[in-house]
Amino acid sequence: MPNAPRVILSGFADEAANHKTAVEQFAAFAALGLQYYSIRFIDVGNGIKNVMALSKPEIQRVRELMNEYELNVSSLGSPIGKIKLSDTDDGTHNKYVPFKQYLNRDVKKACELAHAFETKLIRGFSFYHPKSTDPWEFVTEVVDRLGQIAEVCHRSDLTFGLEVEANLVGQTGELLAEIHRQVNHPAMVLIFDAANVICQGYSTAETFAQYRAMRSGLGWIHIKDYLSPKASEKGGHVDEEILKNFVPADQGDAAHEAILRDFARVIPALERKLRRRGIPGVFLDMEPHVKGGGQFGGFSGPDGMGVALRGLCRVLDYVGIDYHLRDFEDVKAARGF
């Protein structure tokens, strides 16, 4: 598509692997034609670990396999920000870590890992407020913490992406947009995820409005969709049972066609902004969960990831957004003769 806005396709590779081994993940993504992936859970021979728990030898092995399969990391799929704001028993299993300790240990570790995997992007979240409380009451506290996280990332020449997700303070587009406005830091951008909104009981129109609220602060987008007659009470707590009804981007209630058609107008300026921070382009990061989702991840299998990719590509083709999947020119370049 000449002169069409272009995105870089990526995805959470752990969703494509039945056993989350590095070879499974990378073989699936290479076969799908993807050249980027977000790293989250991975097994390098010592069991499944979150990226935050990888040892230096494991990191080195992942890097070797990335080179073998010609993959790059789009973002570090960290769980930064998925802890409680306060040490309050609210009936959930969410853990609490004193913030100064969290900043000096976990956030700095995430920055070190981002550099180890040569990515400029760290995915993160907006902290858990006590269950059944009003998230707006905690915006000021979250802004203070996220401002400090953004500054740590900035000093490491990295960018922190804040994802909209249920049960967190930034659970809606309006909340996340206000947090972004108050933090007002060049190293913090927003990540829209339509399914994370619509599974909270919001309508298609309301989901689009939440995307529009976040649009000026966007850094990249996660792609998954949701279709079920049983969503949660609007804006209420989302439990694990609800997280079983995800579908490809061309089949759900989130209207990715409308979202991506609008986003196409934003891509050129956003790409220029991201490149100034050393980021190669605008990522669409697939996290389809088509075989089930959960609080810290989801699963699609190699077949489900393929179905999700083809569904996304159909939408992109329809709205006029360009992308690249590996072709024979890439194969010729890789074979070295």
Question: Which residues make up each language-model segment?
Answer:
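Short beta-strand segments at enzyme active-site cores
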Residues: 38-39, 73-78, 119-126, 158-163, ...
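Active-site beta-loop-alpha junctions enriched in small/polar residues
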Residues: 12-16, 40-44, 78-81, 127-129, ...
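Aromatic- and glycine-enriched glycan-recognition loops and surfaces
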Residues: 18-23, 50-64, 102
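Alpha-helix-loop-beta-strand connector modules within alpha/beta enzyme cores
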Residues: 56-78, 143-156, 182-183, 255-263
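Active-site acidic/histidine proton-transfer and metal-coordination neighborhood
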Residues: 23, 28, 68, 84-190, ...
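N-terminal substrate-binding region of glycoside hydrolase catalytic domains
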Residues: 12-14, 28, 32-56, 77
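Histidine-acidic metal/acid-base catalytic patches
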Residues: 2-10, 19-35, 67, 173-337
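Surface-exposed, active-site-proximal loop segments in enzymatic domains
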Residues: 43-56, 80-104, 126-139, 236-247, ...
